């Protein structure tokens, strides 16, 4: 460790009770997430309390250093990467503080699946159901304003949030709830929430036309700061503003969330079509019937599912070009079954109709069907090919009625550019993920992906759509957001100045980085022996001489992990790393081993450290049980 980082480590250890990591191996674990990006932090702090978070932010603010808050590190858009101090709330701040009759108070590191298990014992639920609920944290869900397949029934996190404890950019700790704005002339004596509410109210008033134009009520979710519904009953809902803010306005250290009665009976079916267009048109026609979920899959998604399990091969005919997973929920089984009957009948009346229908006969069938939405996508990350579907053009939201039009436009762009992509999403609220095939470690691919994204996002904007509606803008979408919606981006920048005038909180997300620059690149390529020239082989560091793998196989195994975080699963019904469940720290996750080996192979870590105690400590958390 160089003297400068040693000094930083000593400084931070002097003000926080939690862990501080400044060594190269520790930093390598936080240089990537579920996205294509790589950015090595200056330091990592794993706080034990709100006071630790506040002390870290104060230290950073005094020195003009950026702060990036992190939950599970599952972001697909580089949500928590950067060259400043990463604050990992998932290690220690994972306590359910209080459970009431209709609310729950939690720390930001609580895993969504664990929270649902806890609430389920009282027949309550948060309702919001991201596909990666087994790993993602409440703090991350707030930062992204997460929704999920059941948005039609339960909405997004912003609809559940009641109050938050937050650390602001100056290191102060405040409790935020819907607040009355401080009146003119009272700012000097008003408390901090009232002053912030007054500032936000002024921005909303000045930008009312912009917000109405670019965050219309006809679109279920919105990119950037969600400002369309912050004023209610004379109050400014500051907790709602933090939902989707991606840690750029403050760092949530506790949250009070409203809960609702757990869903009763449900009825689920998979409708299969010979055309993606017809599937999308059918989804629009089913919306008046009131489904709780309506997810869309293209033929590549279905083909991938067929390859993962023999049961999917039996369930899905190879001729299927698209599918809709439809769910109805009701207190009474007879009612939701009748509504599903109506949906199936409506689908079969479509132009050319659906070619097949698969109905879940019981809860086990339903859980299996739901794997199409929740588990199949994670297998993309292990595709053993250089060109694979990658998470770069994600999270497009269009008005649901415009979904068929957008998909036609998308197919035209892909065909003209001779691109291949996988398409899936939540058709019920117009949310689409596009995964173009690319080699994520090939430096030249970034330009091609950005050019494709520019075209696809422009098509969405042309029909009243936006980007970043469910997973945030992150590093990958913020530049496109500012170019596509400059007036709305300028309004977001005004809000950012109110909370973080120096721009130290997660710069480069939602608004462009200003005072603090965030330099981020795609992940470094891993040299493979069979592709290297003789000169490159001679220059390459000879790693792990006792390992029986050759370099090419080692690189392929490491590259099979993209950092999605599924190996951090805390879901009680799934099989995953028991060591991580016992000690949920990043170095205990299976992902950590791939991160360290990737850093060694790419040259970011000195190969001489391969035998160091820090590397050995990461390796020793694995006892080869193969549950990952």
Predicted ranges, named:
Residues 141-304, 318-325, 570, 576-608, ...:
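Mobile "lid/hinge" segments at catalytic clefts and subdomain interfaces of large enzymes
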Residues 255, 288-387, 419, 425, ...:
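Terminal amphipathic helices with adjacent charged low-complexity linkers/tails
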